[in-house]
């Protein structure tokens, strides 16, 4: 059994050596073993000191209190508790403790100074508190007085919002009956006052679980949802932020340390479930405005699906699927042109599609997905009614919405009996609303070639009729997009063109015409971009499109409008124009086999060859595509989906392909825009963006390409490209980029080391591929200046130094030899131990060093002579070995050379080495 006294002594030693963690462990073990009260008090006091050093003030105060319970005049424990309480903001209690200390030791200057300081702080706090209380009262008086002038009320409202965002101010408002007064402001029905009240409540809930819980029960979820339901965009958004802050505080997502407050709050799951239920009810209520419905969908999107799929708890999603999936489907099925439609905004149905998609992706197994599908099937089947056309429209609109979300599920639903037939039948209807819904559904349905073939066979003539005859622009543009999508059903395969030669060009021309027509509403022009997203799979169309600068600029301008739902279509169009989509590798033998077995072999369009793609990239850069992409990256996450990010990343990578173009990309902010794409999104998207960053970082000045602190964010994406699963080009360009960055500062070198890049770089130094091996060695050469890297070479039991020495002997690869010799020169200059180690790692070291010193490449020769000088300077015994070999003759020959400008630096180092040998007495001057 361990001795508690010995444990205490060990703890004291750990404390003196600043190892507070182990000290706490020793004191805690001793406390479990000891029964003597006085000894326990000493241990608690000592442990309190450790917690103070670790800035764990709650625990420090608790331990000091336990020591004081044993001995009320324990001056050390009193002072430690005083320090902890001061840090916790409990100045009045801290003052009492230091007052007691000063009574026990009246002449102690530390106690007297602290007593004076705490007294001043308490007075100041009381003054602020009383002035804050009076200010809060004054503000409410002004706001609730109908006779106050407008300017005064606005100022009071803004001050109240600012106070609510500060913890002290929020607490004063709360303690002064502020919640009830804020409710009175809401009841005035004045939009400005409602906005101020909601924003103040939002600030009060931020990062404070107890206050958030109190506000939930004082105001009520029902009331907050009714505020969010009003037809006022700013009020709906403010109420949404209030609910989000409440949810963050209740779940701990605010990332704040709550301390003792944790113990004051009961289980919050019930409150969170009530919030979710109210939000789902809002989706189908006719009393809720379009803005309110959008915010309810946004809150569900943000808080229900898991952020991290490693977390196995998807109970929130399962609850929403069971209780609210049919409600979400009802929103998806709304037809704005029908009289009984729920209030919507242009984004409501898209937000519902995004939510359906996220919920479906969040399901963990096939039974869960089957339940989801069955609910959808039951809902759609229940909506079909031969006697009620409005119900049929609702069913088709629901399928259309699902196709915009989880496409695989939508495709299964399309296979249900009568769904495709109903779509085609509605296309032939005389009612415009029927045509509108049917055409839009056909557009979303024709993504799969099998579905497109059915529509081409059964419905393409109807679409053409609608396009030619209808006078309704909304239907006309949708019919055009439907034809565009059907025309591109063969993808990039030149042999699978669906329409006659030239038909897709005509469709594209009409899309460009509508796109450039600024008199049309944004929604119609958005559909024109959608059409181009399909048609640009045809190389003739993309060539014509990039030549039309007016159309390009019109599309880029649309990206900058408030309606960001266009982003995916724009990104897809640019992916097609730059050919940055995935192309399967063509194996000649497989092509021959396919032809022999009479299988279809995809054909490449002549204009999809490399030189045509490069011309298109040039045109896009001239049209300021980088500014448009940078603007797209800044869009809200609910609109900028991971798939859109991936598309944008593909475009950036294609634009960075030519080294000559990278300067323009950097100048227009492309480097900065790629960083968020490399950190968030799909694995493919992050890899593409990281590769784009590598291309930029390899040839650009990091200070210009990634100004300020951004350069440190680039390191992680670059290191991710060193993974052995990435292809050789990605490995190579990442190494070049890291070489460039590591040459800038030691802080950057430290960041590269911290991101665990060294094992990967060392691995590539063994690579068979010459260029990758060279790039890895060059990177190591730049990193060798770093302290941690030197320590890795100094450590025993590894062959790192041996590898560097052997790479110095690669005479046929001059650049590799140069990098390896540079690394060795840096290491031997920094560590004398490595000079000695170098002579032990391989018996060939002397021969390799001599070859370096005689090398025809002046840079290699310079490095060889520097290494020799380092060895001579390090140790007399090493110098003796070198003098006894042919190295003395080599140094003498170099040192005796006449002064030549291009070789002077080498000659000078050789002479310094000879002087060192002279000092050792190994050689003598000839008089």
Swiss-Prot record:
Q: Which Pfam families does the record match to this protein?
A: TPR_8, UNC45-central
This protein's record includes keyword Cytoplasm: yes
Keywords annotated in UniProt = Chaperone, Cytoplasm, Developmental protein, Differentiation, Myogenesis, Repeat, TPR repeat
The family database entries (SMART domains) matched by this protein are listed as: ARM (SM00185), TPR (SM00028)
Q: Where are the ARM repeats?
A: 167-206, 209-248, 746-785
Which GO terms are recorded in the biological process aspect for this UniProt protein?
Answer: cell differentiation; chaperone-mediated protein folding; lens development in camera-type eye; muscle organ development
**Per-repeat ranges for TPR:** 4-37, 41-74, 76-108
Molecular function GO labels:
Hsp90 protein binding
Highest taxon above the source species: Eukaryota
Quote the cellular component terms of the Gene Ontology held in the record: A band; cytoplasm; cytosol; perinuclear region of cytoplasm; Z disc
Q: Where in the cell is it found?
A: Cytoplasm, Myofibril, Sarcomere, Z line; Cytoplasm, Myofibril, Sarcomere, A band; Cytoplasm, Perinuclear region; Cytoplasm, Cytosol
What job does this protein perform?
A: Acts as a co-chaperone for HSP90 and is required for proper folding of the myosin motor domain. Plays a role in sarcomere formation during muscle cell assembly. Is necessary for normal early lens development.
PANTHER family reported in the protein's UniProt record:
FI21225P1, PROTEIN UNC-45 HOMOLOG B
Q: What is this protein called?
A: Protein unc-45 homolog B
Which gene name does the record give? unc45b
């Amino acid at each position: 059994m361990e001795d508690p006294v010995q444990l205490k002594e060990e703890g004291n030693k750990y404390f003196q050596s600043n190892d507070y963690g182990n000290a706490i462990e020793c004191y805690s073990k001793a406390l479990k073993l000891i029964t003597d009260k006085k000894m326990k008090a000493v241990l608690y006091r000592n442990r309190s000191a450790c917690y103070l050093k670790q800035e764990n003030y709650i625990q420090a105060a608790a331990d000091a209190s336990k020591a004081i319970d044993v001995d009320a005049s324990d001056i050390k424990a009193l002072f430690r508790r005083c320090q902890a309480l001061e840090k916790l903001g409990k100045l009045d209690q801290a003052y009492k403790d230091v007052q007691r200390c000063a009574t026990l030791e009246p002449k102690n200057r530390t106690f007297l100074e602290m007593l004076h300081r705490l007294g001043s702080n308490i007075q100041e706090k009381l003054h602020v508190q009383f002035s804050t209380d009076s200010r809060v009262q004054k503000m409410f008086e002004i706001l609730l007085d109908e006779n106050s002038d407008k300017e005064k009320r606005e100022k009071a409202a803004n001050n109240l919002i600012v106070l609510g965002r500060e913890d002290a101010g929020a607490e004063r408002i709360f303690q002064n009956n502020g919640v009830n007064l804020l409710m009175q402001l809401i009841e005035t029905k004045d939009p400005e006052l409602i906005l101020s009240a909601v924003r103040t409540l939002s600030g009060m809930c931020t990062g404070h679980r107890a206050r958030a819980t109190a506000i939930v029960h004082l105001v009520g979820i029902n009331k907050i949802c009714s505020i969010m339901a009003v037809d006022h965009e700013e009020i709906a958004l403010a109420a949404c932020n209030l609910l989000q802050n409440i949810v963050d505080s209740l779940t701990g997502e605010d990332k704040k340390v709550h301390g003792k407050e944790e113990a004051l709050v009961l289980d919050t799951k019930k409150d969170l479930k009530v919030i979710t239920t109210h939000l789902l009810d809002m989706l189908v209520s006719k009393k809720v405005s379009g803005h309110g419905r959008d915010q309810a969908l946004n809150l569900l999107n943000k808080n229900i699906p898991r952020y991290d799929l490693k977390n196995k708890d998807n109970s929130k999603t399962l609850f929403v699927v069971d209780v609210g999936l049919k409600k979400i489907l009802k929103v998806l099925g709304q037809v704005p042109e029908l009289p009984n439609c729920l209030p919507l905004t242009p984004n409501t149905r898209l937000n519902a599609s995004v939510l359906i998609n996220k919920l479906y992706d969040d399901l963990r197994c096939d039974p869960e997905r089957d339940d989801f599908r069955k609910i959808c099937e039951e809902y759609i089947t229940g909506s079909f009614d031969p006697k009620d056309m409005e119900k049929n429209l609702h069913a088709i609109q629901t399928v259309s919405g699902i196709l915009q979300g989880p496409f695989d599920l939508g495709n299964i639903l399309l296979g249900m009996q009568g769904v495709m037939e109903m779509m085609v039948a509605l296309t032939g209807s005389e009612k415009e609303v029927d045509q509108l819904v049917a055409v839009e559904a056909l557009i979303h349905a024709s993504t799969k070639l099998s579905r497109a073939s059915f529509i081409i066979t059964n419905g393409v003539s109807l679409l053409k009729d609608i396009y030619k005859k209808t006078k309704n622009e909304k239907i006309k543009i949708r019919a055009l997009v439907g034809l565009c999508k059907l025309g591109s059903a063969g993808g990039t395969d030149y042999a699978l063109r669906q329409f006659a030669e030239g038909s897709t060009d005509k469709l594209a021309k009409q899309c460009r015409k509508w796109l450039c027509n600024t008199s049309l509403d944004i929604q119609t022009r958005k559909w024109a971009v959608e059409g181009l997203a399909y048609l640009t799979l045809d190389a003739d169309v993309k060539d014509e499109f990039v030549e039309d600068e007016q159309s390009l600029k019109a599309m880029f301008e649309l990206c900058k409008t408030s309606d960001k739902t266009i982003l995916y279509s724009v990104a897809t169009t640019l992916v097609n124009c730059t050919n940055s989509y995935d192309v399967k590798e063509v194996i000649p033998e497989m092509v021959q086999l396919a032809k022999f077995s009479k299988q279809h072999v995809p054909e490449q369009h002549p204009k999809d060859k490399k030189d045509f793609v490069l011309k298109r990239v040039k045109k896009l850069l001239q049209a300021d595509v980088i500014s448009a992409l940078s603007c797209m990256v800044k869009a809200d996450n609910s609109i900028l989906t991971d798939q859109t990010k991936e598309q944008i990343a593909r475009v950036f990578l294609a634009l960075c392909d030519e080294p000559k173009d990278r300067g323009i990309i950097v100048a227009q902010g492309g480097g900065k825009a790629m960083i968020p794409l490399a950190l968030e999104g799909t694995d493919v998207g992050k890899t593409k963006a990281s590769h784009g960053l590598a291309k930029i970082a390899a040839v650009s000045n990091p200070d210009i390409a990634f100004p300020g602190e951004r350069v440190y964010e680039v390191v992680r994406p670059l290191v991710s490209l060193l993974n052995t699963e990435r292809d050789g080009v990605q490995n190579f360009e990442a190494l070049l980029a890291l070489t460039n960055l590591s040459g800038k500062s030691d802080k950057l070198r430290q960041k590269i080391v911290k991101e665990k890049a060294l094992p990967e770089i060392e691995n590539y130094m063994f690579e068979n591929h010459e260029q990758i091996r060279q790039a890895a060695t060059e990177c190591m050469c730049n990193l060798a200046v770093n302290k941690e890297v030197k320590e890795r070479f100094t450590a025993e039991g590894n062959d790192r130094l041996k590898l560097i020495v052997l790479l110095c002997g690669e005479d046929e690869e001059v650049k590799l030899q140069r990098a390896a010799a540079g690394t060795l020169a840096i290491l031997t200059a920094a560590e004398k131990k490595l000079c000695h180690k170098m002579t032990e790692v391989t018996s060939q070291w002397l021969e390799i060093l001599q070859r370096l010193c005689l090398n025809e490449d002046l840079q290699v020769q310079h490095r060889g002579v520097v290494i020799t000088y380092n060895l001579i300077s390090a140790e007399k015994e090493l110098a003796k070995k070198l003098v006894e070999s042919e190295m003395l003759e080599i140094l003498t020959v170099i040192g005796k050379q006449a002064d030549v400008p291009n070789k002077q630096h080498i000659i000078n180092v050789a002479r310094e080495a000879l002087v060192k040998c002279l000092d050792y007495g190994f050689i003598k001057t000839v008089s």
